[in-house]
Regions:
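Glycine-rich phosphate/pyrophosphate-handling loop used in enzymes and phosphotransfer proteins
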Residues: 1-192
């Protein structure tokens, strides 16, 4: 488990600029964790999201950090990918985090799920099939912002499953910056 600042992430990155303040993750993307996440994502094991969220929120440091955010946004997937998979793995995680934060704080903290602002507009080659350099180019211009005014001056937590090169979350955050939020953080299950 770790929380990394954008400065710490820049040291090992191809991207010149990070459009988010911090990266929160619970696992290293290796071994059995890697297999579990891949099963969750690609092998119709959508039910696993609750277990992953329980691991995340049992960590006091992560729980306290998440409570500082106003809005939670999943990385969107294309309609084609949704049709193939039957679910958006990041949306399931985001919904569960939002519900559990509200429950655990007796509704004193509302981490509002926003699933209609960040839109994936293009089908692209899966990032997992590309090398680091190609991932950056593949993801550019894929997302658009809709109804961004509800994010203005808010703290946003973007949810994804895996952080490999950071290209996907960085592009999402670049687009979200158009709404002029106070802060954007990224939470993933695992970091490569």
């Amino acid at each position: 488990m770790d929380i990394l600042t954008k400065e710490e992430l820049k040291e090992n990155s191809l991207e010149k600029e990070k459009f988010f303040e911090e990266l929160i993750y619970i696992f290293k993307y290796e071994g059995q964790i890697r297999e579990l996440i891949l099963d969750y994502k690609f092998n119709e094991k959508s039910y696993m999201y609750k277990t992953f969220v329980n691991f995340l929120l049992k960590n006091k440091k992560i729980f306290e950090n998440i409570k500082k955010y106003d809005k939670i946004i999943p990385v969107p997937i294309s309609k084609k990918r949704y049709k193939e998979r039957g679910y958006n793995q990041s949306l399931l995680i985001a919904k569960e985090i939002s519900m559990q934060i509200s429950y655990e704080t007796n509704n004193n903290i509302k981490l509002e799920l926003v699933n209609n602002c960040l839109i994936k507009t293009k089908n692209i080659i899966e990032q997992s099939k590309l090398n680091k350099e190609d991932r950056q180019h593949n993801i550019q211009g894929v997302y658009t912002l809709k109804n961004g005014s509800i994010l203005t001056n808010k703290s946003i937590l973007l949810i994804d499953d895996i952080y490999t090169t950071g290209s996907t979350v960085n592009e999402c955050c670049r687009v979200l910056q158009q709404a002029k939020p106070n802060k954007i953080g990224v939470l993933v299950l695992a970091k490569d």
